[in-house]
Amino acid sequence: MTTTPTMTQKLPQALPTASIDLDAIAHNVAVLREHAGPAAVMAVVKADGYGHGATQVARAALAAGAAELGVATVGEALALRRDGVTARVLAWLHPPGTDFAPALLADVDVAVSSLRQFTDLLDAAGRTGRTADVTVKADTGLSRNGVGEADYPALVDALRRAASDGAVRVRGLMSHLAHGDDPEHPFNDVQARRLTEMAKLAGARGVSYDVVHLSNSPAALTRPDLAFDMVRPGIAVYGQTPIPQRGDFGLRPAMTVKCPVSAVRPVRAGDAVSYGHTWTAQTDTTLALVPAGYADGVFRALSNRFEVSINGRRYPNVGRICMDQFVVDLGPGPVDVAEGDDAILFGPGTDGEPTAQDWAELLDTINYEVVTSPRGRIVRTYVGGKGGPQ
């Protein structure tokens, strides 16, 4: 097992941990590959691998057959390169003033969303003497990041000229679904049609794309007709279902967040707990203190609403969640919880523990937000995994 501290290199024992199962990552990539059919799989490892650790997830995904990697920013791509990941990686979100030279020097593919970005990329190619591998990010209806229909022809013409000059290699055309988590929504087909038309327009103007990709996790699992040349799953790589109402798709959640109990103490009926005394013991009972709080990603909005699992049994949080700690009620009578026992905040759910999806439903959010939230003093650890391509 390897350990990666999120904030500090010198760590005391018994800190909260996010344990990442790399075998689950490999399993999930295998599931996605099966659904993708002949299409390749790009494993998206942006946002530090959705909170799971980009480098470790990248290696596990590649070993399981992912063809390449996707990230949001050039900085994320360069971090993978610094860690020795040599596989193809595409970055697609660039603030104004981004210098693409480091990306080109590190053999990072760049997706551009405007003629301005493409001009900046050409400038970097000229300064470095490197040929840029470029993908066009197209807006087909999400109205977010991507070149729109009106500006697309000018960008295609600029691509053709730059490719003719040897400044760029045209690699791909990509877009992103607005209703991917609603597979039957008619707008999914509208976006696919628009993307196809954009590829045809480019061909008519002398530009051809090696790969076209549109599908995110839910589409990769439910809409094989939208696979094009490659699918681009994110959350499914980490085992979280992208469409909870349709089940888990055979995915295995890779993250378990747990924290050792730091104190066990009895209280009497009438004693109140934590800030504001929002919970009062109705009987004599025993409490356990768990040293993780909202600074570590335990949402304060979960106060008095969620449970943890200790030694295979669930216990409710009582009182407000604090910055560094929260309290659970072990109930009256003898208890089988001691200091040092792990309180599982969420995990795969296979042993009855709460899941990230449970938290998402309590918070009226999505499991994406839950798994990207552990931070602060939470230490990332890894189990499973094996060597493979980087």
UniProtKB/Swiss-Prot annotation:
Gene3D superfamilies (alphabetical): Alanine racemase (3.20.20.10), Lyase, Ornithine Decarboxylase, Chain A, domain 1 (2.40.37.10)
Modified residues (N6-(pyridoxal phosphate)lysine): 46
Source organism, top-level taxon: Bacteria
Named cofactor requirement(s): pyridoxal 5'-phosphate
Alphabetized GO MF terms: alanine racemase activity; pyridoxal phosphate binding
GO cellular component: cytosol
Keywords: Isomerase, Pyridoxal phosphate
PROSITE patterns (UniProt xref): ALANINE_RACEMASE
UniProt cross-references to SMART domains, sorted A to Z: Ala_racemase_C
Catalytic reactions of this protein: L-alanine = D-alanine
Entry annotation: catalytic residues: 46 (proton acceptor), 275 (proton acceptor)
Keyword Isomerase carried by entry: yes
Group of enzyme by EC: isomerase
Pathway(s) this gene product operates in, as recorded in its UniProt entry: Amino-acid biosynthesis; D-alanine biosynthesis; D-alanine from L-alanine: step 1/1
EC number: 5.1.1.1
Binding site for substrate: 144, 323
GO biological process per UniProt: D-alanine biosynthetic process; peptidoglycan biosynthetic process
Signal peptide location: none
Pfam families found in the cross-reference section: Ala_racemase_C, Ala_racemase_N
Family in the record: Belongs to the alanine racemase family.
Function: Catalyzes the interconversion of L-alanine and D-alanine. May also act on other amino acids.
Name of this chain's protein: Alanine racemase
Organism placement in taxonomy: Bacteria, Bacillati, Actinomycetota, Actinomycetes, Mycobacteriales
